[in-house]
Amino acid sequence: MKTLKTLKIFIIICIASVSLASFAGFGESCSSLPTTSDGYLETDTAYGYIIRNIDMKDPRGNCNSAASSITFCFKNIEGSSSPCTIYNLNEGDSKKISDLSTDNNPDLGANPVLKDIVLTVKKWDNDLCLVMPTSRGPMPVACKSLSATPTPTPPDDENCNIGKSCYTGANYSQSLINFSGLAVQCLSETLNKVFFAGNSCSSQDQNSRITNLAAFSTFQGYLKRIIGAALILYTMFFAFNMALNKEYASTEKIALFVIKFLLVAYFSIGLGPLDFSGGQPTKENGMLKYGLPLLTGAAPDFAQMIFNAAGSRGLCQFDNSKYKDGYKFYGLWDAIDCRIGYYLGLDLLYNIDKNGVLGNSIGNGPGGNNTPIPNFDPDGKKDRPKDLSKAGALRFFAVMFGFFMAGNVIILAAGLVFSVIFLSILLYFITHYLVCMITIYVMTYISPIFIPMALFTRTKAYFDGWLKVCISCALQPAVVAGFIALLITMYDSAIFKNCEFLRYDYEKGDIRFSTFELRLPNGGADKCQESFGYKMLQYYAGEGWEEHLLILFPIKSIVKDVVSILAELLCVLVFSVIFYYFSKSIGRFASDLTNGPNMDAVTASPTKIVDLVKKGAAFLKDAAMASQGKPSVGDKPDVGGKRKEGEQQGGDSESGAGGGLADLASGSGGGK
C-alpha cells in the first residue's frame, strides 16, 4: 500500500515537473538572440512579449542544425490540453500571429495589436531565425544554428558610397533643429568611404554596359607601392654612400637616417602587418591613425572651447556627457543650430509646448532662476494669429508681419536685415569649415607623395608647403569660430541682456534633445523684461496682438511697445552692420594668421545674400524709374563709370589674391 502511494506521488511529481518545464521553457531559443543596449525591445514592446511565448529547446522543439527548416512551439491559451502548438517553417515562409495562434487566445491571435504581425524565416548571419519587424528594424525572435556556413548575401548597393550618418546623423544631435552637425558628419563619413575605405558597391552585372572605375583607395594602394619602391632605392643609395664614404658611416648619421626613414615610411605607406582586422593582416598607417583624426578634430575642439566662453548664461549650452562617443563634436554645431531656431522664434526651443509634442522632461540643467516666466496667454486669445499655435513654427517672421500690418515698416526692414546678415555669416562659417575639412582629406590622400619629399633637400620645400596647408586648414575654422563666438555674444547681450535660461532635457527612444526656457534673474529682472528677446517672447505667446478692420477684412497686428522694440532692434541692427563689413575680411585675416591659403574663393560669401538683396532692390528701382520714363541709374554716365571702375578694382583685387596664392605655391615649390 505504501509502495502504491509512493508510486502515485512520484508520478504526480514527474507530471508536474514536465508541465512546469514545458511552460518554463518559453522564451528559449536554440541560439542566443541579439540584445539592444537599453533592453527596450526585450522588455517594453511586442517583440519581447512574442519571444516569451515561443519555445525551441523543449523536447517538442527542434534544434537540429542539419535541417533546413525551423521548428518551434507557439504557446496555447491557458487550460489547453497541450501547452503549445508545434510549427515547422522553411526559409522564406511567413505567417501572421493570428495564423499561428488559432485557439482564439486573447493574449496572442485574438489580440488586435499582435494578430497582424508577420513572422518570417530568414538567415541571420550563421543562424536560421524567425524574424519580426520592430521599430529598430527586423529582429529575430527565435534562432537555430546552421551546420554549413551560409552563402554570403549580396551587399546592398543603396548608399554604398555615402556615410550612414547622412540619414541617421540627426539621432546624435541634442538640438531640435539640426542640420550643420549632420552635414559635417555626413561629409566626413562619405569622404572616408570614398578616399580610404574603398568602394563597397557590388560589381555590375556582366550584361551591364556600365563600367566601374577604380576606387580612390585602389589608386592610393598602387601609389604606395611605387613610393615603397622609391624608399627601397633611397635605402640602397644611402648604403652605397656609406660604403664609399666614411662620413656616412658615422653613428649619428645612421641613427638619423633610421629615424627619418621609419617616420616617413610609417606616415606615408604604413608599416606592417602590425595588427589584424577580420583575421587578415593589415598595415598600420600613421597618417590615417593619428594624422587625419588630429587634423579634423583640432578645428571643432578649438572652436568649441571658444564657444563655451561666449553667449548668454545657459542659452544653447548642451550637456556634453549625453553625446555618444565619437559624436561629441555635435556640441559646437548644436549651439549654432539652436541659436538659429531661438533667434527665429522656434516655439519648442523656448519650451512652449501647447500641443504636447515634447512629452515629459527627464531632467533640468544647472542655472536659471527657479521662478518661471509668467504664463503668457494661458487661454489662447482670439486676437493672436493662428500660425502662433502651430508646433515648430518660426514665429519671428509672423511677428514681423504683425508689425508690417500695423504700418511699422522700419521694424520689418530692420528685422529682415538682422535675420539675413545673421544667417549669411553662419552659412559662411559652416561652408568654410566644410571646405577646410575637404582640403584636409585631400591632403591626407596625397600624403604618400609629399611626406617622402622631406627626405631630400631639393624637395623639402614641397613637404613644407603641404604641411603648411594641413595645419592652416585645421586652425582657420577656429579663427572664424572666434569671430562667430564674438558675434553670438554681442547678439545675446543685445537681444536678451541679463536674462537667464533653464535647460530641460527630453528623451524619446535613442533621441535626446533639450529646450531652453527663458527665466528672469534674481536681481535686475526689470532689465530682462525690457529686452528685445523678452518682448518677442510675449508676442510669440500671443500677447500684444490686436485685431481691427482694414477696409472690409479683419487683420491682426502689433501696436504694443513699438517705440522700445524699434530702439532695441536698431541696436541689434547696428551690431549686424558692423559684423557684416568685418565679415568681408575675416577669411583673409584667418589665412594670414595661419599662414595658409585664403578659402574665400571656394566658400559661401558672408555678404552674398545681402548683395543679392541689394541687386534686387536696385533692379526694382531701375524698373520703376523706367516705367515713369526716367533714365535708370545704370544709364547715367558718371554712375556707370563708377560702377565699371569698382568692378575693375574688384577684378584687380581678385587677380591680386590669385597672384598671391600663385606666389605662395611657387614659394612652396622652390628651395629656401
Swiss-Prot record:
The cellular location(s) given in this protein's UniProt record come to: Cell membrane
The residues forming the signal peptide are 1-24
Q: Which UniProt keywords apply?
A: Cell membrane, Membrane, Signal, Transmembrane, Transmembrane helix
Q: Which GO terms describe its cellular component?
A: plasma membrane
Its transmembrane ranges are 226-246, 254-274, 410-430, 436-456, 469-489, 562-582
Q: Does the keyword Transmembrane apply?
A: yes
Q: Please name the InterPro entries in this protein's record.
A: Conjugal_tfr_TrbL/VirB6
Q: Where is this region: Disordered?
A: 626-672
Chain intervals with Gly residues compositional bias:
656-672
Membrane topology per record = Multi-pass membrane protein
Q: Some GO term, biological process aspect, for this entry: which one? A: protein secretion by the type IV secretion system
Q: Bias regions of kind Basic and acidic residues — which residues?
A: 633-647
User: What Pfam families does the database record attribute to this sequence?
Assistant: TrbL (PF04610)
Family, according to the entry, reads as follows: Belongs to the TrbL/VirB6 family.
Name of the protein this chain belongs to: Uncharacterized protein RF_0090
Q: What is the lineage of its organism?
A: Bacteria, Pseudomonadati, Pseudomonadota, Alphaproteobacteria, Rickettsiales
